Amino acid sequence: MKRIPKGLSLLLVLACLLVLACFGTVLAQAQDPRAPPAAYLRSGTLLHRGPFPTPFKHVVVIFQENRTPDNLFQGLCHPPFGHRHSCSTTPRARQYNISTKGWLDKNSPTGVTDPGPVPLGNTYDLSHAHAAFLSMYDGGRMDGAGDIHCSGTCPTTPQFKFVDNSTGILDPYLELATQYGWANYMFQTNQGPSFPAHQFIFGGTSAPSADDDAAGIFAAENMSGTPGPAGCIALLGTFVRLVTPSGESGEIYPCFEHQTISDLLNNHGVSWKYYTPGAGSIWTAPNAIQHICVPDAPTGGKCGGWDWVNNVDLKPANVLNDISACNLAQVSWVIPIGQNSDHPGNPNTVGGPSWVAAIVNAIGNDTTCGYWSNTAILITWDDWGGWYDHEPPPILNGVQGDYQYGFRVPLIVVSAFTPRQYINNEPHDFGSILRFIQRVFDLGEGSLGFADARATGDLKGFFRFDRGPRSFQTIMAPLDANFFRNDTRTPDPPDND
């Protein structure tokens, strides 16, 4: 018998060990229900390592409130920002996926209702609880919006309305959408309201723990019980309802413990800041994470953790000061005061378009810090707000499908490397935003193992790096940065429905 050369023998042994290791990994994944889906492993995108080959050194996430594309962006379908062929419910590459008429309504004798206009600062609010999602979704028929509860001064068919732009109040949003990138298929990750939505955009899950996320158990609603602050400083008797694969079941004190993307940023020396209007707000995601808040009492206390003290800023307009002072963190979440949030139900809530424009203009017109050429700005809305939208959301397979995904929300991507009037037709959710941050800063895509791992993309299609940075043109708006810096109004509280 021929003897195998010693060097070749060693190579064969190493090859066998490699095969056994791969087999063991596959077997472990088959046995562990929390293992990443095989599709992600095959594609090699789940734990992608290596920096995104971009000039980005900063990512700013601007998180507005309670709108759908059909409700807020009808202006893309009409002059001066579009025309009757600009929009379609079966869009081609250069069309916006927006429905302008014949909205599905099972309560109408004709089966449809044509939408009508309402002001941005309107007089009523629609439920956006999990039950409201189920009503509107109606088993995938998307015709149940008329069953969503309305509170306040409600017109006829209040759910079937779009924001009136006859005064030009939405022009800053429309200018941004047509000058930069728009997502036709951006879905909120959760099927419910603001508190869980903010948990997803910051931590990738609204589950109380990593084990709960793997089991499909999520915080589904805003606070109930004793009125007061949210998160780990909530009062005794405050709770949040849970949703499980068998439906809404049980409740829990709203203080959770699991990793968030801020932990990944800390571990890699990447700075971050969360601008928000109140320590106890349901919009303040870090207040519900035990190791960030570090409350000084079991209930009803104050947050005092290192990350809380150093990285949570309770005055949103300080983002404008930090930009002008060249002190912008590498990753920022910007949560507005109620008056600038686009949240329905208050005639004073009309500052959103100017607020967003002020932040974009501060970055775009910067001549000292170099922010325009190295910052990606992601503008999105936290949930659908009970408004009609025609596009049915994809529902996840497995136990997470009991609460993911929700309805569409707008997403506008602004950067010096985003083509003019770019329309993206890939599916996205808040997990896509987390993946984008992970890839830009080499954190490992999907490494939290939550919505970031379940997302199918990371927004890279919005950018073209084979050409130099675009020059910036100021976004015209009625109110400028000085208005917001000097605004002394008491912030309107968020909804709690």
State each model region's role.
Residues 11-22:
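Bacterial N-terminal signal peptides
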Residues 27-497:
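N-terminal pro-sequences and low-complexity stem/linker regions of secreted or lumenal proteins
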Residues 1-12:
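Bacterial N-terminal signal peptides that target proteins for export
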Residues 7, 25-27:
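A composition/secondary-structure signal for short, hydrophobic, low-basic-content segments
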